[in-house]
Amino acid sequence: MQQIHRLERKLLRATAEAIRDFDLVSQGDRIMVAVSGGKDSYTLLHLLMRLRERAPIDFDLVAVNLDQGQPGFPAHVVEDHLRSLGVPYRMLQRDTYSVVRRLVPEGKTTCPVCSRLRRGVLYNAAVEMGCTKIALGHHRDDLVETLLLSALYSGALKSMPPKLRSRDGRNVVIRPLCYAAEEDVAAFAEAMRFPIVPCDLCGSQPNLRRKRVKRLLAELSAEHPAVKGNLLHALGHVVPSHLLDRDLHRQLADATGRDPWLDAEDEEAEDCGEPAGDGVVSLGGARGGR
Protein backbone atom coordinates (compact mmCIF):
# COMPACT_ATOMS: atom_id res chain seq x y z
CA MET A 1 0.00 0.00 0.00
CA GLN A 2 2.87 2.36 0.78
CA GLN A 3 4.34 1.71 -2.67
CA ILE A 4 1.00 2.55 -4.29
CA HIS A 5 0.78 5.86 -2.43
CA ARG A 6 4.38 6.74 -3.28
CA LEU A 7 3.91 6.00 -6.98
CA GLU A 8 0.56 7.75 -7.08
CA ARG A 9 2.00 10.91 -5.55
CA LYS A 10 4.88 10.89 -8.01
CA LEU A 11 2.60 10.39 -11.00
CA LEU A 12 0.04 12.90 -9.78
CA ARG A 13 2.79 15.49 -9.42
CA ALA A 14 4.12 14.81 -12.92
CA THR A 15 0.64 14.92 -14.45
CA ALA A 16 -0.38 18.10 -12.63
CA GLU A 17 2.84 19.80 -13.71
CA ALA A 18 2.30 18.86 -17.34
CA ILE A 19 -1.28 20.10 -17.22
CA ARG A 20 -0.09 23.39 -15.74
CA ASP A 21 2.94 23.84 -18.02
CA PHE A 22 1.03 23.24 -21.23
CA ASP A 23 -2.46 24.43 -20.23
CA LEU A 24 -3.97 21.04 -21.02
CA VAL A 25 -7.21 21.34 -19.04
CA SER A 26 -9.56 24.32 -18.83
CA GLN A 27 -12.66 25.25 -16.89
CA GLY A 28 -15.69 23.40 -18.23
CA ASP A 29 -13.76 20.90 -20.34
CA ARG A 30 -15.42 17.61 -21.18
CA ILE A 31 -12.49 15.26 -21.65
CA MET A 32 -12.68 11.95 -23.45
CA VAL A 33 -10.13 9.56 -21.95
CA ALA A 34 -9.23 6.91 -24.52
CA VAL A 35 -8.99 3.66 -22.54
CA SER A 36 -7.50 0.80 -24.52
CA GLY A 37 -7.15 -1.61 -21.63
CA GLY A 38 -3.40 -1.08 -21.33
CA LYS A 39 -1.35 0.14 -18.38
CA ASP A 40 -0.93 3.67 -19.73
CA SER A 41 -4.58 4.49 -20.36
CA TYR A 42 -5.76 2.89 -17.11
CA THR A 43 -3.21 4.95 -15.19
CA LEU A 44 -4.15 8.13 -17.05
CA LEU A 45 -7.82 7.69 -16.20
CA HIS A 46 -7.04 7.02 -12.54
CA LEU A 47 -4.83 10.11 -12.26
CA LEU A 48 -7.30 12.43 -14.00
CA MET A 49 -10.07 11.21 -11.71
CA ARG A 50 -7.89 11.92 -8.66
CA LEU A 51 -6.86 15.34 -9.95
CA ARG A 52 -10.46 16.28 -10.66
CA GLU A 53 -11.22 15.77 -6.96
CA ARG A 54 -8.75 18.46 -5.95
CA ALA A 55 -8.57 20.74 -8.99
CA PRO A 56 -9.54 24.42 -8.61
CA ILE A 57 -11.53 24.14 -11.85
CA ASP A 58 -14.46 21.98 -12.90
CA PHE A 59 -14.11 19.52 -15.75
CA ASP A 60 -15.84 16.30 -16.74
CA LEU A 61 -14.38 12.96 -17.75
CA VAL A 62 -15.84 10.26 -19.95
CA ALA A 63 -13.91 7.06 -20.61
CA VAL A 64 -14.18 5.54 -24.09
CA ASN A 65 -13.07 2.08 -25.14
CA LEU A 66 -12.99 0.96 -28.76
CA ASP A 67 -13.46 -2.68 -29.74
CA GLN A 68 -11.89 -2.85 -33.20
CA GLY A 69 -13.03 -6.38 -33.93
CA GLN A 70 -9.75 -8.06 -33.02
CA PRO A 71 -10.20 -11.80 -32.42
CA GLY A 72 -10.68 -12.53 -28.74
CA PHE A 73 -10.81 -8.91 -27.58
CA PRO A 74 -12.32 -9.09 -24.07
CA ALA A 75 -14.37 -5.89 -24.07
CA HIS A 76 -16.15 -7.02 -20.91
CA VAL A 77 -12.86 -6.80 -18.96
CA VAL A 78 -12.50 -3.10 -19.70
CA GLU A 79 -16.20 -2.40 -19.20
CA ASP A 80 -16.28 -4.17 -15.84
CA HIS A 81 -13.35 -2.04 -14.67
CA LEU A 82 -14.90 1.21 -15.87
CA ARG A 83 -18.20 0.32 -14.24
CA SER A 84 -16.42 -0.37 -10.95
CA LEU A 85 -14.88 3.12 -11.03
CA GLY A 86 -18.23 4.82 -11.37
CA VAL A 87 -16.92 7.00 -14.18
CA PRO A 88 -19.16 7.79 -17.17
CA TYR A 89 -18.05 5.58 -20.04
CA ARG A 90 -18.96 4.48 -23.52
CA MET A 91 -18.05 1.27 -25.32
CA LEU A 92 -17.61 1.63 -29.09
CA GLN A 93 -17.55 -1.17 -31.65
CA ARG A 94 -16.05 -0.62 -35.09
CA ASP A 95 -14.64 -3.42 -37.23
CA THR A 96 -11.41 -1.76 -38.29
CA TYR A 97 -9.54 -5.06 -37.88
CA SER A 98 -10.81 -6.46 -41.19
CA VAL A 99 -9.90 -3.19 -42.92
CA VAL A 100 -6.36 -3.38 -41.54
CA ARG A 101 -5.98 -7.00 -42.63
CA ARG A 102 -7.09 -6.05 -46.12
CA LEU A 103 -4.71 -3.11 -46.43
CA VAL A 104 -1.55 -4.42 -44.73
CA PRO A 105 0.51 -7.21 -46.34
CA GLU A 106 1.04 -10.37 -44.29
CA GLY A 107 4.03 -10.12 -41.97
CA LYS A 108 4.06 -6.31 -41.89
CA THR A 109 3.25 -4.37 -38.76
CA THR A 110 -0.37 -3.28 -38.68
CA CYS A 111 0.10 -0.70 -35.93
CA PRO A 112 0.35 2.49 -38.05
CA VAL A 113 -2.80 1.78 -40.09
CA CYS A 114 -4.66 0.47 -37.05
CA SER A 115 -3.73 3.59 -35.10
CA ARG A 116 -4.96 5.94 -37.83
CA LEU A 117 -8.29 4.13 -38.11
CA ARG A 118 -8.72 4.09 -34.34
CA ARG A 119 -7.92 7.79 -34.14
CA GLY A 120 -10.56 8.56 -36.75
CA VAL A 121 -13.22 6.67 -34.82
CA LEU A 122 -12.30 8.43 -31.58
CA TYR A 123 -12.28 11.85 -33.26
CA ASN A 124 -15.78 11.34 -34.62
CA ALA A 125 -17.04 9.99 -31.29
CA ALA A 126 -15.60 12.98 -29.43
CA VAL A 127 -17.54 15.38 -31.63
CA GLU A 128 -20.75 13.36 -31.27
CA MET A 129 -20.35 13.29 -27.48
CA GLY A 130 -19.57 16.99 -27.18
CA CYS A 131 -16.07 16.42 -25.81
CA THR A 132 -13.69 19.37 -25.91
CA LYS A 133 -10.49 17.35 -25.47
CA ILE A 134 -9.24 13.80 -26.08
CA ALA A 135 -6.69 12.55 -23.53
CA LEU A 136 -4.19 9.91 -24.65
CA GLY A 137 -1.85 7.90 -22.44
CA HIS A 138 1.51 8.61 -24.09
CA HIS A 139 4.24 9.01 -21.47
CA ARG A 140 7.78 10.37 -21.32
CA ASP A 141 9.35 7.29 -22.87
CA ASP A 142 6.98 7.46 -25.84
CA LEU A 143 8.03 11.06 -26.49
CA VAL A 144 11.73 10.28 -26.19
CA GLU A 145 11.52 7.19 -28.40
CA THR A 146 9.58 9.15 -31.01
CA LEU A 147 12.22 11.90 -30.96
CA LEU A 148 14.95 9.38 -31.77
CA LEU A 149 12.82 7.54 -34.33
CA SER A 150 12.13 10.81 -36.14
CA ALA A 151 15.77 11.88 -36.10
CA LEU A 152 17.26 8.50 -37.01
CA TYR A 153 14.76 7.26 -39.58
CA SER A 154 12.98 10.38 -40.89
CA GLY A 155 15.64 13.07 -40.58
CA ALA A 156 13.43 15.42 -38.57
CA LEU A 157 13.69 16.82 -35.05
CA LYS A 158 10.20 16.26 -33.72
CA SER A 159 8.29 14.18 -31.22
CA MET A 160 4.77 13.98 -29.77
CA PRO A 161 3.49 17.40 -28.69
CA PRO A 162 1.77 17.70 -25.30
CA LYS A 163 -1.31 18.97 -27.11
CA LEU A 164 -2.38 19.42 -30.70
CA ARG A 165 -5.38 20.22 -32.85
CA SER A 166 -6.46 17.47 -35.21
CA ARG A 167 -6.03 18.05 -38.92
CA ASP A 168 -9.75 18.47 -39.43
CA GLY A 169 -9.74 21.16 -36.74
CA ARG A 170 -12.52 19.54 -34.72
CA ASN A 171 -10.56 18.03 -31.84
CA VAL A 172 -7.84 18.92 -29.36
CA VAL A 173 -5.66 16.01 -28.24
CA ILE A 174 -3.77 16.21 -24.94
CA ARG A 175 -1.05 14.01 -23.39
CA PRO A 176 -1.10 14.61 -19.62
CA LEU A 177 1.42 11.81 -18.95
CA CYS A 178 4.15 13.42 -21.06
CA TYR A 179 6.33 13.96 -17.96
CA ALA A 180 5.67 10.50 -16.47
CA ALA A 181 8.29 7.75 -16.76
CA GLU A 182 7.10 4.46 -18.21
CA GLU A 183 8.67 2.50 -15.38
CA ASP A 184 6.56 4.42 -12.87
CA VAL A 185 3.40 3.92 -14.91
CA ALA A 186 4.10 0.20 -15.24
CA ALA A 187 4.86 -0.21 -11.54
CA PHE A 188 1.70 1.68 -10.58
CA ALA A 189 -0.50 -0.33 -12.94
CA GLU A 190 0.91 -3.56 -11.54
CA ALA A 191 0.47 -2.43 -7.94
CA MET A 192 -3.12 -1.39 -8.66
CA ARG A 193 -3.77 -4.71 -10.41
CA PHE A 194 -5.43 -3.09 -13.37
CA PRO A 195 -7.04 -5.72 -15.66
CA ILE A 196 -4.60 -5.36 -18.54
CA VAL A 197 -5.73 -6.37 -22.02
CA PRO A 198 -2.77 -7.38 -24.23
CA CYS A 199 -2.19 -5.22 -27.28
CA ASP A 200 -1.10 -8.06 -29.58
CA LEU A 201 -4.44 -9.84 -29.96
CA CYS A 202 -4.38 -9.00 -33.65
CA GLY A 203 -1.15 -10.96 -34.12
CA SER A 204 0.61 -7.90 -35.50
CA GLN A 205 4.36 -7.86 -35.87
CA PRO A 206 5.94 -5.42 -33.42
CA ASN A 207 7.33 -2.10 -34.55
CA LEU A 208 10.92 -3.28 -34.88
CA ARG A 209 12.39 0.20 -35.16
CA ARG A 210 10.69 1.36 -31.96
CA LYS A 211 11.81 -1.80 -30.18
CA ARG A 212 15.37 -1.18 -31.33
CA VAL A 213 15.27 2.41 -30.07
CA LYS A 214 13.78 1.23 -26.77
CA ARG A 215 16.66 -1.25 -26.37
CA LEU A 216 19.18 1.47 -27.20
CA LEU A 217 17.70 3.76 -24.56
CA ALA A 218 17.74 0.94 -22.02
CA GLU A 219 21.43 0.31 -22.69
CA LEU A 220 22.29 4.01 -22.44
CA SER A 221 20.21 4.39 -19.28
CA ALA A 222 22.07 1.51 -17.67
CA GLU A 223 25.28 3.51 -18.14
CA HIS A 224 23.77 6.91 -17.40
CA PRO A 225 20.34 6.87 -15.68
CA ALA A 226 19.50 10.46 -16.64
CA VAL A 227 19.54 9.80 -20.40
CA LYS A 228 15.76 9.69 -20.91
CA GLY A 229 15.19 12.70 -18.69
CA ASN A 230 17.87 14.63 -20.55
CA LEU A 231 16.30 13.84 -23.91
CA LEU A 232 12.94 15.05 -22.67
CA HIS A 233 14.69 18.12 -21.27
CA ALA A 234 16.16 18.71 -24.74
CA LEU A 235 12.67 18.82 -26.24
CA GLY A 236 11.99 21.89 -24.11
CA HIS A 237 15.36 23.54 -24.65
CA VAL A 238 15.82 24.06 -28.37
CA VAL A 239 18.71 26.32 -29.40
CA PRO A 240 17.86 27.43 -32.97
CA SER A 241 21.22 29.16 -33.49
CA HIS A 242 22.92 25.77 -33.17
CA LEU A 243 20.72 23.96 -35.68
CA LEU A 244 20.61 23.88 -39.48
CA ASP A 245 16.97 24.77 -40.08
CA ARG A 246 17.14 27.56 -42.66
CA ASP A 247 13.42 28.34 -42.51
CA LEU A 248 13.57 28.77 -38.75
CA HIS A 249 16.76 30.81 -39.14
CA ARG A 250 15.03 33.09 -41.64
CA GLN A 251 12.03 33.57 -39.35
CA LEU A 252 14.25 34.49 -36.42
CA ALA A 253 16.32 36.83 -38.55
CA ASP A 254 13.19 38.60 -39.81
CA ALA A 255 11.81 38.89 -36.28
CA THR A 256 15.00 40.16 -34.63
CA GLY A 257 16.85 41.87 -37.47
CA ARG A 258 19.94 39.85 -36.57
CA ASP A 259 21.58 36.72 -37.93
CA PRO A 260 21.07 34.01 -35.27
CA TRP A 261 24.00 31.97 -36.54
CA LEU A 262 26.40 34.89 -36.17
CA ASP A 263 25.11 35.41 -32.62
CA ALA A 264 25.75 31.78 -31.71
CA GLU A 265 28.41 31.04 -29.14
CA ASP A 266 31.42 29.07 -30.34
CA GLU A 267 30.84 25.83 -28.45
CA GLU A 268 32.55 22.52 -28.91
CA ALA A 269 30.45 19.42 -28.29
CA GLU A 270 31.44 18.06 -24.91
CA ASP A 271 30.93 14.54 -23.62
CA CYS A 272 30.61 15.63 -20.03
CA GLY A 273 28.16 12.94 -19.05
CA GLU A 274 26.41 15.26 -16.63
CA PRO A 275 22.60 15.36 -16.39
CA ALA A 276 20.85 18.45 -17.68
CA GLY A 277 19.07 18.87 -14.39
CA ASP A 278 16.16 17.61 -12.37
CA GLY A 279 12.74 19.00 -11.70
CA VAL A 280 10.31 20.72 -13.98
CA VAL A 281 11.30 23.36 -16.45
CA SER A 282 8.67 26.04 -16.83
CA LEU A 283 7.60 27.88 -19.95
CA GLY A 284 7.01 24.75 -21.96
CA GLY A 285 10.10 22.98 -20.70
CA ALA A 286 10.42 19.36 -19.72
CA ARG A 287 11.38 17.24 -16.79
CA GLY A 288 15.01 16.22 -16.47
CA GLY A 289 16.27 13.21 -14.60
CA ARG A 290 14.20 10.12 -13.98
UniProtKB/Swiss-Prot annotation:
Subcellular location: Cytoplasm
GO molecular function, one term: transferase activity
EC class name: transferase
Cofactor(s) the protein requires to work: Mg(2+); [4Fe-4S] cluster
Top-level division of the source organism's lineage: Bacteria
UniProt remark on cofactor binding: Binds 1 [4Fe-4S] cluster per subunit. The cluster is chelated by three Cys residues, the fourth Fe has a free coordination site that may bind a sulfur atom transferred from the persulfide of IscS.
Residue ranges annotated as motif PP-loop motif: 36-41
GO BP terms, alphabetized: tRNA modification
GO CC term (a single one): cytoplasm
Segments of this protein annotated with the region Disordered: 259-290
Pathway(s) where this gene product acts: tRNA modification
Keywords: 4Fe-4S, ATP-binding, Cytoplasm, Iron, Iron-sulfur, Magnesium, Metal-binding, Nucleotide-binding, RNA-binding, Transferase, tRNA processing, tRNA-binding
PANTHER family documented for this protein: AMINOTRAN_5 DOMAIN-CONTAINING PROTEIN, SULFURTRANSFERASE-RELATED
Assembly mode: Homodimer.
Protein known as: tRNA-cytidine(32) 2-sulfurtransferase
